[in-house]
């Protein structure tokens, strides 16, 4: 049995740890609130640009923009979104496990795919396994602005247009609620499906100067918005996962403290009983 000093030391250290995890839980809750607000605020813009792109794309019968045309898939790019830090439960491991399994199942060689890594955890994961990384972005912070990822998104879209890869898939954690996040894979390029408009145009447009030039500007913005929206979604998921992980850690610490306190009291009671027994035994020996 551990000594009273050892048990007391463990109780003290566990209490200090629980104070840290409790503080991290509260910080993550505040960050989650802001991240969720940012994601929800971006949703109306995303819905509107999707509607406009759908209507313009359906109306421009003669448009042959490369972002709208499916081609033979020789190489697929996977844009994988993770965090820069850990202590977020299964947030990173679940999305990386899904991305890794998908790549292994779909591709026979490294020439058939490439990875675009957002987040230090994901970047390090793919580097460790010597998987091809086309580009990376780390150190974004807790509140991401479009300006921070503008270069990456534009380069990614341009590389697709230039033929560096033939499909682009997003792999990230979709925010469902504070206690639930779902790993999501979404094909971004080529833009062959504009969502839930039922295949019917909801508006018609007159193009000036023509539909080709309108799509030349609109389609890259739409693809970039899809990536940015997924990143906002992932950030909310990250803070939710970290808040949940820290809450679980705090609860576990409390249970451990209760268990250690019980062990401490039992050990102390046993020590007192032993001392009383020795005193009584010594007194009896003197009689």
From Swiss-Prot:
GO terms for molecular function: ATP binding; proton-transporting ATP synthase activity, rotational mechanism. One of its GO terms (biological process) is proton motive force-driven plasma membrane ATP synthesis. InterPro entries: ATP_synth_F1_ATPase_gsu, ATP_synth_F1_gsu, ATP_synth_F1_gsu_CS. GO terms for cellular component: plasma membrane; proton-transporting ATP synthase complex. The keyword Disulfide bond does not apply. The keyword Transport applies. It is a peripheral membrane protein. Keywords: ATP synthesis, Cell membrane, CF(1), Hydrogen ion transport, Ion transport, Membrane, Transport. Its main location: membrane. Signal peptide: none annotated. It is found in: Cell membrane. Gene3D superfamilies: 3.40.1380.10, ATP synthase, gamma subunit, helix hairpin domain. It comes from the Bacteria. Produces ATP from ADP in the presence of a proton gradient across the membrane. The gamma chain is believed to be important in regulating ATPase activity and the flow of protons through the CF(0) complex. Belongs to the ATPase gamma chain family. NCBIfam families: ATPsyn_F1gamma (TIGR01146). F-type ATPases have 2 components, CF(1) - the catalytic core - and CF(0) - the membrane proton channel. CF(1) has five subunits: alpha(3), beta(3), gamma(1), delta(1), epsilon(1). CF(0) has three main subunits: a, b and c. This is ATP synthase gamma chain. It comes from Bacillus velezensis (strain DSM 23117 / BGSC 10A6 / LMG 26770 / FZB42) (Bacillus amyloliquefaciens subsp. plantarum).
